[in-house]
Amino acid sequence: MILPSMYVFPDPPEADPEGQGLICIGADLEPSTLFEAYTHGLFPWFNEGDPICWWSPEPRCVIYPEQYQPSKTLIRSMKKYDYQITMNRAFEKVIRSCALPRNYTNETWISEDIVQGYVELFKAGYAYSVEVWENDQLIGGLYGVNIGKGCFGESMFSLRTDTSKIAFYTLMLIGQENQVPWVDCQLVNDHLISLGACTLSRQAYLKSLQDVIIQPPINWKRYQERVFSSKRIAQNAKLTE
């Protein structure tokens, strides 16, 4: 259960009429604050040691699960290696793996405060993870926030070729099976565009957001008690019968 937040976030278009994206600075990363932020179209993004910055970009990057098509290369990889895929089994391991330095930089925006805030949000039932395993080793995954039918992607990681893409494809199938209209990808980048993402105006995103967050949430229990095979997913293009 999420208690009411002690913070009130400003309306993004009023706080940022020029569309620069930064809405406000401050507050904390308690679950109630994160919940309040996401339901108003904001997310935290800041460097470790800096004040907490809350963003609502113009435009907003989203991807539509119903329109997503995995690449032929990804399908071949899923059939070749047959990894195991789970949901909500190792949320903290996933977010900590996402926080590790990448090959191209030693910096990370996923601070210990971010980790603790989202772990608590997960415990409250408003965050999710998708894990990719090779036997007992976690080799890829992603995490995000889920409120109603609102699905918000946060970060992903990969220790083997394509394992973050396998997690992403799995999330798209979850979205298809639960009538999730879009997955919020926040900021536009070339990698997301290559996966099929597109942009919405901030106004259109905020209007849609208010509709989706009041819808029945994703039924994660139907997935998290099972272990899925990447080979079977690639063959069937679905998770449940």
Curated annotation (Swiss-Prot):
GO molecular function annotation: leucyl-tRNA--protein transferase activity
Pfam families named among the record's database cross-references: Leu_Phe_trans
Transmembrane portions of the chain: none
One GO CC term on file: cytoplasm
GO biological process: protein catabolic process
Enzyme Commission number, as recorded: 2.3.2.6
Enzyme class, UniProt record, top EC level: transferase
Entry keyword set: Acyltransferase, Cytoplasm, Transferase
Name by which UniProt lists this protein: Leucyl/phenylalanyl-tRNA--protein transferase
Gene source species: Acinetobacter baylyi (strain ATCC 33305 / BD413 / ADP1)
